Protein backbone atom coordinates (compact mmCIF):
# COMPACT_ATOMS: atom_id res chain seq x y z
CA UNK A 1 0.00 0.00 0.00
CA UNK A 2 1.02 3.66 -0.25
CA UNK A 3 2.59 5.50 2.66
CA UNK A 4 0.05 6.19 5.43
CA UNK A 5 -1.34 9.67 5.83
CA UNK A 6 -0.76 11.84 8.87
CA UNK A 7 -4.26 10.98 10.10
CA UNK A 8 -3.61 7.27 9.68
CA UNK A 9 -0.34 7.56 11.58
CA UNK A 10 -2.15 9.42 14.35
CA UNK A 11 -4.74 6.63 14.46
CA UNK A 12 -2.01 3.98 14.65
CA UNK A 13 -0.19 5.94 17.32
CA UNK A 14 -3.37 6.18 19.37
CA UNK A 15 -3.97 2.44 19.01
CA UNK A 16 -0.40 1.70 20.09
CA UNK A 17 -0.74 4.07 23.05
CA UNK A 18 -3.84 2.20 24.19
CA UNK A 19 -2.23 -1.17 23.48
CA UNK A 20 0.77 -0.27 25.62
CA UNK A 21 -1.49 0.70 28.50
CA UNK A 22 -3.59 -2.46 28.16
CA UNK A 23 -0.46 -4.61 28.15
CA UNK A 24 0.74 -2.94 31.34
CA UNK A 25 -2.59 -3.51 33.11
CA UNK A 26 -4.08 -6.75 31.80
CA UNK A 27 -2.24 -7.95 28.69
CA UNK A 28 -3.66 -8.47 25.21
CA UNK A 29 -2.67 -5.10 23.76
CA UNK A 30 -1.89 -6.61 20.36
CA UNK A 31 -5.61 -7.26 19.98
CA UNK A 32 -5.81 -3.47 19.57
CA UNK A 33 -2.64 -2.60 17.65
CA UNK A 34 -2.76 -5.48 15.13
CA UNK A 35 -6.30 -4.79 13.86
CA UNK A 36 -5.49 -1.06 13.72
CA UNK A 37 -2.86 -1.88 11.10
CA UNK A 38 -5.39 -4.01 9.23
CA UNK A 39 -7.87 -1.14 9.36
CA UNK A 40 -5.57 1.28 7.53
CA UNK A 41 -5.03 -1.23 4.74
CA UNK A 42 -1.98 -3.34 5.54
CA UNK A 43 -2.15 -7.02 4.53
CA UNK A 44 -2.31 -9.40 7.47
CA UNK A 45 1.30 -10.61 7.31
CA UNK A 46 2.66 -7.07 6.94
CA UNK A 47 0.44 -5.92 9.81
CA UNK A 48 1.66 -8.78 11.99
CA UNK A 49 5.39 -8.25 11.38
CA UNK A 50 5.02 -4.48 11.82
CA UNK A 51 3.23 -5.07 15.10
CA UNK A 52 6.01 -7.44 16.23
CA UNK A 53 8.63 -4.74 15.64
CA UNK A 54 6.53 -2.04 17.32
CA UNK A 55 6.21 -4.13 20.50
CA UNK A 56 9.94 -4.28 21.27
CA UNK A 57 10.32 -0.92 23.08
CA UNK A 58 7.28 -1.65 25.22
CA UNK A 59 8.71 -4.99 26.35
CA UNK A 60 12.06 -3.30 27.06
CA UNK A 61 10.38 -0.65 29.18
CA UNK A 62 8.42 -3.24 31.11
CA UNK A 63 11.52 -5.30 31.79
CA UNK A 64 13.39 -2.23 33.03
CA UNK A 65 10.51 -1.37 35.36
CA UNK A 66 10.74 -4.86 36.90
CA UNK A 67 14.52 -4.88 37.39
CA UNK A 68 14.22 -5.17 41.17
CA UNK A 69 12.03 -8.28 40.85
CA UNK A 70 14.57 -9.79 38.44
CA UNK A 71 17.32 -9.73 41.05
CA UNK A 72 18.45 -13.29 41.78
CA UNK A 73 16.80 -14.65 38.61
CA UNK A 74 19.79 -14.27 36.30
CA UNK A 75 20.17 -18.02 35.90
CA UNK A 76 16.52 -18.45 34.96
CA UNK A 77 16.67 -15.55 32.51
CA UNK A 78 19.74 -16.96 30.78
CA UNK A 79 18.48 -20.56 30.58
CA UNK A 80 14.87 -19.81 29.65
CA UNK A 81 15.97 -16.88 27.49
CA UNK A 82 17.99 -19.25 25.31
CA UNK A 83 14.96 -21.54 25.00
CA UNK A 84 12.78 -18.54 24.16
CA UNK A 85 15.20 -17.34 21.49
CA UNK A 86 15.18 -20.72 19.73
CA UNK A 87 11.38 -20.91 19.90
CA UNK A 88 10.97 -17.35 18.63
CA UNK A 89 13.29 -18.04 15.71
CA UNK A 90 11.28 -21.13 14.81
CA UNK A 91 7.97 -19.28 15.04
CA UNK A 92 9.20 -16.34 12.99
CA UNK A 93 10.65 -18.65 10.34
CA UNK A 94 7.25 -20.31 10.11
CA UNK A 95 5.59 -16.90 9.76
CA UNK A 96 7.93 -15.76 6.99
CA UNK A 97 7.22 -18.95 5.07
CA UNK A 98 3.44 -18.67 5.43
CA UNK A 99 1.47 -17.20 2.55
CA UNK A 100 -0.90 -14.31 3.21
CA UNK A 101 -3.86 -16.54 2.34
CA UNK A 102 -2.79 -19.20 4.84
CA UNK A 103 -2.12 -16.60 7.52
CA UNK A 104 -5.53 -15.01 6.90
CA UNK A 105 -7.10 -18.43 7.46
CA UNK A 106 -5.49 -18.99 10.86
CA UNK A 107 -5.64 -15.44 12.26
CA UNK A 108 -9.24 -15.67 13.58
CA UNK A 109 -8.33 -18.82 15.51
CA UNK A 110 -5.17 -17.20 16.89
CA UNK A 111 -7.15 -14.15 18.02
CA UNK A 112 -9.67 -16.43 19.77
CA UNK A 113 -6.80 -18.31 21.43
CA UNK A 114 -5.37 -15.03 22.71
CA UNK A 115 -8.82 -14.06 24.02
CA UNK A 116 -9.21 -17.41 25.78
CA UNK A 117 -5.80 -17.06 27.41
CA UNK A 118 -6.63 -13.56 28.57
CA UNK A 119 -9.99 -14.68 29.95
CA UNK A 120 -8.75 -17.66 31.96
CA UNK A 121 -5.29 -16.44 32.99
CA UNK A 122 -6.19 -15.50 36.59
CA UNK A 123 -8.03 -18.81 37.12
CA UNK A 124 -5.26 -20.79 35.46
CA UNK A 125 -2.58 -19.13 37.55
CA UNK A 126 -4.41 -19.88 40.81
CA UNK A 127 -5.35 -23.44 39.84
CA UNK A 128 -1.99 -24.78 38.68
CA UNK A 129 0.60 -22.50 40.25
CA UNK A 130 3.72 -24.53 40.97
CA UNK A 131 2.11 -27.89 40.15
CA UNK A 132 3.50 -28.69 36.72
CA UNK A 133 6.62 -30.93 36.70
CA UNK A 134 9.78 -28.83 36.53
CA UNK A 135 11.10 -30.71 33.49
CA UNK A 136 8.20 -29.43 31.39
CA UNK A 137 9.15 -25.77 31.87
CA UNK A 138 11.56 -25.48 28.95
CA UNK A 139 9.21 -27.35 26.61
CA UNK A 140 6.29 -25.11 27.51
CA UNK A 141 8.37 -21.93 27.22
CA UNK A 142 9.61 -23.12 23.82
CA UNK A 143 6.05 -23.64 22.57
CA UNK A 144 5.00 -20.26 23.94
CA UNK A 145 7.93 -18.61 22.17
CA UNK A 146 7.05 -20.34 18.89
CA UNK A 147 3.54 -18.90 19.21
CA UNK A 148 4.97 -15.47 20.06
CA UNK A 149 7.34 -15.50 17.12
CA UNK A 150 4.50 -16.45 14.78
CA UNK A 151 1.73 -14.14 15.99
CA UNK A 152 2.52 -12.34 19.25
CA UNK A 153 -0.92 -11.46 20.63
CA UNK A 154 -1.31 -13.12 24.02
CA UNK A 155 2.38 -14.04 24.33
CA UNK A 156 2.76 -12.52 27.79
CA UNK A 157 -0.42 -14.18 29.02
CA UNK A 158 0.74 -17.56 27.74
CA UNK A 159 4.22 -17.24 29.26
CA UNK A 160 2.88 -16.11 32.63
CA UNK A 161 0.53 -19.10 32.78
CA UNK A 162 3.41 -21.44 31.86
CA UNK A 163 5.75 -19.97 34.47
CA UNK A 164 3.07 -20.02 37.16
CA UNK A 165 2.36 -23.67 36.36
CA UNK A 166 5.97 -24.75 36.79
CA UNK A 167 7.42 -22.39 39.41
CA UNK A 168 6.22 -21.83 42.97
CA UNK A 169 7.22 -18.18 43.04
CA UNK A 170 5.84 -14.75 43.91
CA UNK A 171 3.61 -13.48 41.09
CA UNK A 172 5.51 -10.20 40.77
CA UNK A 173 8.77 -12.10 40.26
CA UNK A 174 7.07 -14.36 37.73
CA UNK A 175 5.71 -11.31 35.94
CA UNK A 176 9.23 -9.86 35.81
CA UNK A 177 10.58 -13.11 34.37
CA UNK A 178 7.72 -13.21 31.88
CA UNK A 179 8.61 -9.69 30.75
CA UNK A 180 12.26 -10.58 30.24
CA UNK A 181 11.39 -13.67 28.18
CA UNK A 182 8.84 -11.69 26.17
CA UNK A 183 11.57 -9.16 25.39
CA UNK A 184 13.83 -11.96 24.11
CA UNK A 185 11.05 -13.27 21.86
CA UNK A 186 10.24 -9.76 20.62
CA UNK A 187 13.88 -8.90 19.82
CA UNK A 188 14.55 -12.17 17.98
CA UNK A 189 11.32 -11.82 16.00
CA UNK A 190 11.93 -8.14 15.23
CA UNK A 191 15.44 -8.80 13.93
CA UNK A 192 14.22 -11.64 11.72
CA UNK A 193 11.24 -9.82 10.26
CA UNK A 194 13.29 -6.63 9.96
CA UNK A 195 15.76 -8.46 7.74
CA UNK A 196 13.37 -10.66 5.80
CA UNK A 197 9.77 -9.50 6.35
CA UNK A 198 7.54 -6.77 4.87
CA UNK A 199 7.81 -4.36 7.82
CA UNK A 200 6.15 -0.96 7.40
CA UNK A 201 8.88 1.04 9.11
CA UNK A 202 7.23 4.45 9.46
CA UNK A 203 4.13 3.09 11.26
CA UNK A 204 6.37 0.78 13.30
CA UNK A 205 8.43 3.73 14.54
CA UNK A 206 5.36 5.80 15.41
CA UNK A 207 3.70 2.90 17.19
CA UNK A 208 6.87 1.93 19.06
CA UNK A 209 7.17 5.37 20.60
CA UNK A 210 3.49 5.52 21.46
CA UNK A 211 3.51 2.06 23.03
CA UNK A 212 6.26 3.10 25.45
CA UNK A 213 4.24 6.13 26.56
CA UNK A 214 1.14 3.96 26.96
CA UNK A 215 3.06 1.34 28.89
CA UNK A 216 4.42 3.89 31.35
CA UNK A 217 1.00 5.47 31.81
CA UNK A 218 -0.62 2.05 32.22
CA UNK A 219 1.92 0.95 34.79
CA UNK A 220 1.35 4.11 36.83
CA UNK A 221 -2.42 3.72 36.87
CA UNK A 222 -2.66 -0.09 37.02
CA UNK A 223 -3.43 -0.13 40.75
CA UNK A 224 -6.37 2.28 40.37
CA UNK A 225 -8.11 0.75 37.35
CA UNK A 226 -10.44 -2.28 37.44
CA UNK A 227 -8.15 -4.73 35.67
CA UNK A 228 -10.87 -7.40 35.58
CA UNK A 229 -13.31 -5.15 33.75
CA UNK A 230 -10.60 -4.12 31.30
CA UNK A 231 -9.66 -7.77 30.75
CA UNK A 232 -13.23 -8.73 29.85
CA UNK A 233 -13.62 -5.67 27.66
CA UNK A 234 -10.58 -6.70 25.64
CA UNK A 235 -11.85 -10.29 25.47
CA UNK A 236 -15.24 -9.17 24.13
CA UNK A 237 -13.55 -6.90 21.61
CA UNK A 238 -11.27 -9.74 20.51
CA UNK A 239 -14.15 -12.16 19.97
CA UNK A 240 -15.93 -9.62 17.77
CA UNK A 241 -12.67 -9.01 15.91
CA UNK A 242 -12.19 -12.75 15.31
CA UNK A 243 -15.69 -13.02 13.84
CA UNK A 244 -15.09 -10.00 11.58
CA UNK A 245 -11.76 -11.42 10.39
CA UNK A 246 -13.34 -14.82 9.72
CA UNK A 247 -16.06 -13.22 7.59
CA UNK A 248 -13.72 -10.99 5.56
Task: Provide a role label for each language-model segment.
Residues 1-9, 38-46, 93-104, 194-202, ...:
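Helix-coil boundary and interhelical linker segments in multi-pass alpha-helical membrane proteins
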Residues 1-43, 128-182, 205:
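Selected transmembrane alpha-helices and immediately adjacent juxtamembrane segments
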Residues 14, 18, 53-56, 60, ...:
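Hydrophobic residues within alpha-helical transmembrane segments
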Residues 17-21, 36, 63-64, 89-93, ...:
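Alpha-helical transmembrane segments of multipass membrane proteins
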Residues 49-102, 186-229, 233:
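Selective hydrophobic functional segments
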Residues 57-62, 112-119, 162-167, 212-218:
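Alpha-helical transmembrane segments and their membrane-interface exit regions
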Residues 61-71, 109-133, 240-248:
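Transmembrane helix exit motif
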Amino acid sequence: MTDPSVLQLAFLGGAALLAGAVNAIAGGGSLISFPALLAVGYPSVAANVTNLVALVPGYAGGTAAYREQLRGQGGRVRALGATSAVGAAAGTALLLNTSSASFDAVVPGLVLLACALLAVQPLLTRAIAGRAPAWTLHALVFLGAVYGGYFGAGLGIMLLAVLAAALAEDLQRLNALKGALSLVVAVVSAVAVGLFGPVAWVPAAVMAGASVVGGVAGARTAQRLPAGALRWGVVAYGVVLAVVLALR
